[in-house]
């Protein structure tokens, strides 16, 4: 069935042949399921831009969180390196001062 215009003559022809009740119920069930599928397809088409936008926002938020974590980690490493260098400088100056006293 390519169009609704072909569906109406088919329904008229079926009613003219006086089909059994079970057959009519089967056709009605098939038609309802097909209509339900069309409605779901339309809803999905209408709502897909919104879901794509929310996915994009979620991805951007995840990227921002990763960048912040990397920045915090690099700052922590820099602080450790700076603290280590200061500690080494203190140890070296102590070692030199102790050596001067020993000689």
Curated annotation (Swiss-Prot):
Its main location: mitochondrion. Keywords: Apoptosis, Mitochondrion. It is found in: Mitochondrion. GO terms for biological process: extrinsic apoptotic signaling pathway; positive regulation of cold-induced thermogenesis; positive regulation of extrinsic apoptotic signaling pathway. GO terms for cellular component: mitochondrion. InterPro entries: G0S2. Directly interacts with BCL2; this interaction prevents the formation of the anti-apoptotic BAX-BCL2 complex. Promotes apoptosis by binding to BCL2, hence preventing the formation of protective BCL2-BAX heterodimers. This is G0/G1 switch protein 2. It comes from Mus musculus (Mouse).
